[in-house]
Amino acid sequence: MKKGTVLNSEISSVISRLGHTDTLVVCDAGLPIPNSTARIDMALTQGVPSFMQVVDVVTREMQVEAAILATEIKQQNPQLHETLLTHLEQLQQHQGNTIKISYTTHEQFKKLTADSQAVIRSGECSPYANVILCAGVTF
């Protein structure tokens, strides 16, 4: 049995194949996922697993150098926005690097998902609970 933190074989596989600046999306249950992009569907029911549960597990195994969020999260989901920013702050301290955070419109965000290595769908049912994680290097 795998000893690492990620037991899901699809998530483990996609993270292991990420190169520098490749992207991986963690999204809520409602984000449209392009047919051309790999979908890893973790959603079991509303809220299970939560967006932050998925982000937490993914970022334990993935080196993150940047994160992209939809601007709308600031107004439409401020509590989750703050939780995510706190998580990313703690992650950069743990990794020993600065994680660049940027924002774009939700419409542009949806277009950017098409270039991702995969989209991991959570069971989150709150607005704009989506992040594009950009892979860094560990050296």
Swiss-Prot record:
Segments traversing the membrane: none
Catalytic reactions of this protein: beta-D-ribopyranose = beta-D-ribofuranose
EC number: 5.4.99.62
Pfam families in UniProt: RbsD_FucU
GO molecular function, one term: monosaccharide binding
Positions contributing to substrate binding: D28, H106, Y128, A129, N130
Any single GO CC term annotated in Swiss-Prot or TrEMBL for this entry: cytosol
GO biological-process terms attached to the record: D-ribose catabolic process
Signal peptide region: none
InterPro entries xrefs: D-ribose_pyranase, RbsD-like_sf, RbsD_FucU
Keyword vocabulary terms for this entry: Carbohydrate metabolism, Cytoplasm, Isomerase
Pathway: Carbohydrate metabolism; D-ribose degradation; D-ribose 5-phosphate from beta-D-ribopyranose: step 1/2
Quaternary organization: Homodecamer.
NCBIfam families membership: PRK11797.1
Entry similarity comment: Belongs to the RbsD / FucU family. RbsD subfamily.
Protein task: Catalyzes the interconversion of beta-pyran and beta-furan forms of D-ribose.
Protein name as it appears in the record: D-ribose pyranase
Gene expressing this chain: rbsD
